[in-house]
Each structure stands twice: as C-alpha cells, then as structure tokens.
C-alpha cells in the first residue's frame, strides 16, 4: 500500500506542477479571457493530449468562464488510426470536431522523396485550422508547443537564419483575424513525457507520413538536453533570457534608435544606467546601502 500511495502522490504532484506552469503562462500573457471559446488542437501526440487535459482541469477551478472545443485534423496519412481520437474525445464528454483534409497527397506531390515535409505540412495545416476556427466561432486557437520547442526554435533561428527570434506564447495571425496561444510555453518536455505515461494517453505516432525528421531541430534538441545534463541551470537561464531583453545592448536599429542616441542631462545615478553598463561613484553609495553589489550588478534580493 505504501508504494501505491507514493505513486499516487507523485502523479498528483506532477499534475499540480503542470497546472501551475500552464496557469502561470495563461496569466502572464493574457492567453484566455472570460467568455473565450478555445479551440484546442489535438494531434494525438503527448503534448496536445496533456494541453487538453490540463486546460480542462483549469477550467473547473478558473475564476473565469471559457469554452473548450477539441479539434483534430485528419490529413489522410497512411495507416492513420482514424477512430483513436474520436473515441478518446468522446470519452471525455467534450465538444470536438474532426476535420478531414487530404494534405498528405498534396505534400507528397510537391516535396521530393526523402526530403522533410514538415514545413509545407505545417503551413497547410495552419490555414485549415484558421478556417475551422472561424466556422466554430473560436476566439483562441491553442497549440501544444512547450518550452523546449520554443528554445529549439530560438536556437534554430540564431544558428541557421541569423535572427534573434523564437516562438511567441501568444500571437496574432498575419491577417489579424486569429489569436494563437501556447499554454505549454513554460512546461519542459520531460514533464510532458512523464505525464503521458501516467495518464496512459492513446498516443498516435508522428511518423506515419514517412517524412524524414527535421535534422536541424533534432541537433538543437540534443544540444539542449546535453547542456541540461552537463550544465544544470543553463537551459533555464537561456529560457529566462527571453523574458529580459535589453534592445540597447543588441544591434537592431529598428528595436533601438542608435543613430539618434545623445547625451542626456536629465537622468542621473543608477536610474540613468538601468539598461546595462552601470558605473558606481560616491553619489550612488546611499542608493546601494540596502542592496548588494555583485560584479557590478545591483541585486536587492540577495
């Protein structure tokens, strides 16, 4: 009995942590508002299953009212288990919609054999999901990208595209008609892997299309996992850095007006240097009396 209680305790602990992280992301970025109808995109993978499950749990205790409708896009891939998701969603007792669109044939016709089809497939899928959201009257579209997806995208853009660009937790579509949210933005993938096992989700393999894996993304994934093992805290700090941007210390002239930067006589002391390179003189000492200086950084929390 002791072992069983321990297992149940650990499962509840994981569920609470996921609820906390998802709830925090929703609150931080204003993802869901009172009266929203959230279209939860469910692919049959561990991430979207967990997202749906956690959103359902949060809806029960949230101080606001919002609807959930689960949507799956059946892209007519060979050997796709067409009844798996309908049966599962039906068992949950929630509204759901299965959209059948043969994008598989389109992608196979356009992309050469042996090449990854993920890019074109995702763009086709996005257009269909936007249309379905309109038809269902959904005000938000929830996707199951997690923290690791966001970091991998950041690194991919830096290494292969020369851009400091990630994957936003909330965005407006190019046509301005849809709001896409990523409630799992704060959730590490390893927690979702554990949760999928605990919940025994009916996972549908993601390689049914026969596409080659995105090797560049796989390299980023392995690199981040290697960092996590060898340098604890590095990945978390990398993710944290996305929350603390200092445009004046980068090189994007559109994000910061370097050309018109001039000496200012209106700012003084620590306030004048809040964006980065801080110097200390005698006049600053009173302001620092209650704080701690470490390597030139004023950290009042220490």
Swiss-Prot record:
Pfam families in the record: ATP_bind_3 (PF01171)
Family label: Belongs to the TtcA family.
Recorded catalytic activity of this chain's protein: cytidine(32) in tRNA + S-sulfanyl-L-cysteinyl-[cysteine desulfurase] + AH2 + ATP = 2-thiocytidine(32) in tRNA + L-cysteinyl-[cysteine desulfurase] + A + AMP + diphosphate + H(+)
Protein origin, superkingdom: Bacteria
Positions that bind [4Fe-4S] cluster: 118, 121, 209
UniProt-listed InterPro entries: Rossmann-like_a/b/a_fold, TilS/TtcA_N, tRNA_Cyd_32_2_STrfase, tRNA_thiolation_TtcA_Ctu1
Quaternary structure annotation from Swiss-Prot or TrEMBL: Homodimer.
NCBIfam families assigned: PRK10696.1
Name the UniProt record assigns to this protein: tRNA-cytidine(32) 2-sulfurtransferase
GO terms of biological process kind: tRNA thio-modification
Listed GO CC annotations: cytoplasm
Molecular function GO terms recorded: 4 iron, 4 sulfur cluster binding; ATP binding; magnesium ion binding; sulfurtransferase activity; tRNA binding
Subcellular localization, as worded in the UniProt entry: Cytoplasm
Cofactor note: Binds 1 [4Fe-4S] cluster per subunit. The cluster is chelated by three Cys residues, the fourth Fe has a free coordination site that may bind a sulfur atom transferred from the persulfide of IscS.
Organism of origin: Polynucleobacter asymbioticus (strain DSM 18221 / CIP 109841 / QLW-P1DMWA-1)
Additional note from the record: The thiolation reaction likely consists of two steps: a first activation step by ATP to form an adenylated intermediate of the target base of tRNA, and a second nucleophilic substitution step of the sulfur (S) atom supplied by the hydrosulfide attached to the Fe-S cluster.
Locus of motif PP-loop motif: 43-48
Keyword NAD annotated: no
Known pathway: tRNA modification
Parts forming coiled coils: none
Keyword tags: 4Fe-4S, ATP-binding, Cytoplasm, Iron, Iron-sulfur, Magnesium, Metal-binding, Nucleotide-binding, RNA-binding, Transferase, tRNA processing, tRNA-binding
């Amino acid at each position: 009995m002791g072992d069983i209680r321990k297992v149940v305790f650990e499962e509840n602990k994981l569920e609470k942590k996921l609820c906390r992280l998802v709830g925090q992301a929703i609150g931080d970025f204003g993802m869901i508002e009172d009266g929203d109808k959230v279209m939860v995109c469910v692919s049959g993978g561990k991430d979207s299953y967990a997202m749906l499950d956690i959103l359902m749990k949060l809806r029960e205790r949230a101080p606001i009212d919002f609807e959930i409708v689960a949507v799956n896009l059946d892209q007519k891939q060979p050997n796709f288990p067409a009844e798996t998701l309908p049966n599962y969603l039906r068992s949950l007792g929630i509204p759901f919609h299965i959209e059948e669109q043969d994008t598989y044939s389109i992608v196979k016709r356009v992309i050469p054999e042996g090449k990854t089809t993920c890019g074109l497939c995702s763009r086709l899928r996005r257009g269909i999901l936007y249309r379905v959201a309109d038809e269902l009257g959904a005000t938000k579209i929830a996707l199951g990208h997690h923290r690791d997806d966001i970091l991998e995208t950041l690194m991919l853009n830096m290494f292969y595209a020369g851009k400091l660009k990630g994957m936003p937790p909330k965005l407006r579509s190019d046509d301005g008609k849809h709001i896409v949210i990523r409630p799992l933005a704060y959730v590490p993938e390893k927690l979702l892997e554990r949760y999928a096992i605990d919940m025994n989700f009916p996972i549908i393999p993601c390689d049914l299309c026969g596409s080659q894996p995105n090797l560049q993304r796989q390299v980023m994934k392995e690199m981040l996992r290697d960092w996590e093992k060898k340098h604890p805290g590095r990945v978390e700090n990398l993710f944290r850095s996305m929350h603390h941007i200092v445009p004046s210390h980068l090189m994007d002239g559109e994000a910061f007006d370097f050309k018109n930067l001039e000496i200012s006589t209106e700012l003084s002391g620590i306030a004048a240097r809040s964006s980065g390179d801080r110097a200390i003189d005698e006049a600053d000492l009173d302001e620092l009396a209650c704080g701690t200086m470490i390597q030139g950084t004023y950290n009042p929390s220490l």
